[in-house]
């Protein structure tokens, strides 16, 4: 009986480790020429949920999302906005229905995200840490 419990514990721990390893390090980025420094998780969550439309210095902020099936998008929202995919969909449905706003523009993947953010000083997005190049500046690693 005890060996069965130990086996289950070992399997659970192995699965937890595998799941953690599968998650990449997501970072929040702006164009390298954007003057914004570090931002808090709450400030970024406000921008990505439409509750704020500007960077802390008052300049316009344009959030850009990866597509709804992106694992990076899921990780970003769980870590930053605290919403999973279903909660995010419900949130935006409510906001759209009430006329209070529209969800951020979506891009199809990391390459498009990198291009969109690096070419617009008002853009803010997220990528895996390994996908960052010199055209981008990391403002938060949640």
Task: Give the predicted meaning of each segment.
Residues 25-142:
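Exported/periplasmic ABC-transporter solute-binding proteins
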Residues 19-24:
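Sec/Tat signal peptide C-region and signal peptidase I cleavage site
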Residues 1-11:
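Bacterial N-terminal signal peptides that target proteins for export
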Residues 15-16:
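Short, linear, compositionally biased motifs with a strong N-terminal bias
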């Amino acid at each position: 009986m005890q060996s069965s419990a130990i086996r289950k514990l070992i399997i659970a721990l192995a699965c937890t480790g595998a799941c953690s390893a599968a998650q990449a390090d997501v970072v929040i980025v702006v164009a390298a020429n954007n003057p914004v420094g570090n931002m808090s998780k709450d400030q970024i969550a406000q921008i990505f949920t439409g509750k704020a439309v500007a960077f802390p210095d008052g300049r316009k902020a344009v959030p850009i999302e990866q597509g709804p099936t992106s694992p990076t998008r899921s990780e970003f929202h769980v870590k930053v906005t605290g919403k999973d995919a279903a909660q995010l969909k419900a949130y935006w449905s409510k906001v759209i229905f009430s006329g209070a706003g529209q969800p951020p523009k979506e891009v199809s993947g990391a390459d498009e995200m990198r291009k969109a953010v690096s070419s617009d000083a008002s853009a803010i997005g997220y990528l895996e840490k390994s996908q960052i190049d010199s055209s981008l500046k990391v403002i938060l690693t949640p």
